[in-house]
Design a protein with these regions (language model features):
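Gly/Ser/Thr-rich active-site loops/lids in small-molecule metabolic enzymes
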Residues: 159-168, 212, 216, 221-241
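Short Gly/Thr/Asp-enriched flexible loops that form oxyanion-binding sites at enzyme active sites
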Residues: 76-88
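Catalytic core of DAGKc-family lipid kinases
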Residues: 48, 86-203, 207
Length: 323
């Protein structure tokens, strides 16, 4: 068979979050489908109607399809991954990033322009990607605690739809982060990671597999591997004042890790023990509150359509060419 028309069309489950990114998906469904080359996919389209719905859709329907494509923000991708993994389904994942920040898309090199992202999926090129596990719940790129980490899920959806990324800036810095920094309260935590132990007062912590967190903190691409079985553990020790907190934010963005007040470690398993229940954020969504958090890396747990990228250690075999 030498032509697209002679090839079997692949069955694609398209999960659409109609509220993502200024309601772009709600208004432009036909544009989304038309972005793909003709004759490549047979689409079944399912809309999410509430938080957690993409988990249910992926879990209940994905095994009937050759691939799953999610259209929305990082939270929609998170739910899609959770649904696939809970069902034990290993079909490749396509991502059309239409959220307000799209941190993971930036890391993976997935275009934010719809047609380019669709063409990438149609090309068939995938990479094996590490997924995080937090007390049995999967996350695609970051788990974190501390001031400012609630910004994404505390920002009203209407504000996100109206202002996009600017909504995070307004809600984050003026309505949430500044008041939080005015009342800096470190947590006393015991941290075990890969056979090592830390115990001290900490202000912030994250466990991530990304070059960008919340669109604000940037890590050097040379420090990150997306499929090496390790995530990056970032810890900020107790700070003396709100002014010191702003200085620390600046140091994080400059990647000035001194190993004392600002700790940067690669690890495959981390256990946090808090004296009081602590709220966690997973991929920008509320991850619950608990005194003990067990984090681990699930090495190359999913296959995601993405371009060749030096942050991937392994060369993934290309899916059967579709165009």
């Amino acid at each position: 068979m030498n032509s697209t028309t002679e090839r079997r069309r692949k069955k694609a489950l398209l999960i659409v979050n109609p509220c993502a990114g200024k309601n772009r998906t709600r208004a432009n469904l036909s544009e989304i489908v038309d972005a793909f080359p003709d004759g490549v996919f047979d689409f079944t389209i399912k809309y999410t109607t509430c938080q957690g719905d993409a988990i249910n859709i992926a879990r209940d329907f994905a095994r009937k399809y050759d691939l799953v494509i999610c259209c929305g923000g990082d939270g929609t991708l998170n739910e899609t991954i959770n649904g696939l993994m809970s069902a034990g389904v290993s079909v490749p994942i396509g991502y059309l990033p239409m959220g307000s920040t799209n941190d993971l898309a930036a890391t993976l090199g997935i275009p934010t322009k719809l047609k380019e992202a669709a063409e990438l999926i149609a090309s068939g090129h995938t990479n094996g990607y590490d997924v995080g596990d937090c007390n049995g719940h999967q996350f695609s790129y970051v788990a974190c605690f501390g001031p400012g980490t609630k910004i994404s899920y505390s920002t009203p959806q209407k504000m996100k739809n109206l202002l996009g990324y600017n909504a995070y800036m307004i809600n984050g810095f003026f309505l949430h982060l500044i008041p939080a920094l005015a009342d800096v309260k470190p947590r006393h935590i015991k941290i075990k990671y890969d056979g090592n132990v830390l115990e001290d007062d900490f202000y912030f912590g994250s466990f991530s597999n990304s070059t960008s967190v919340a669109g604000l903190f940037k890590f050097d691409k040379n420090d990150i591997k997306l499929d090496d079985g390790k995530f990056e553990l970032l810890l900020v020790r107790k700070l003396s004042s709100p002014l010191a907190a702003f200085g620390m934010l600046h140091r994080i963005m400059k990647r000035d890790f001194d190993g004392d007040s600002l700790i940067f470690i690669k690890a495959s398993e981390v256990k946090f023990t808090f004296e009081k229940p602590e709220e966690w954020t997973l991929d920008g969504e509320c991850g619950g509150s608990t005194t003990q958090v067990d984090l681990k890396v699930l090495n190359r747990a999913v296959s995601i359509f993405s371009p060749e990228n030096p942050m991937f250690s392994y060369k993934e075999e290309k899916e059967e060419a579709t165009v």
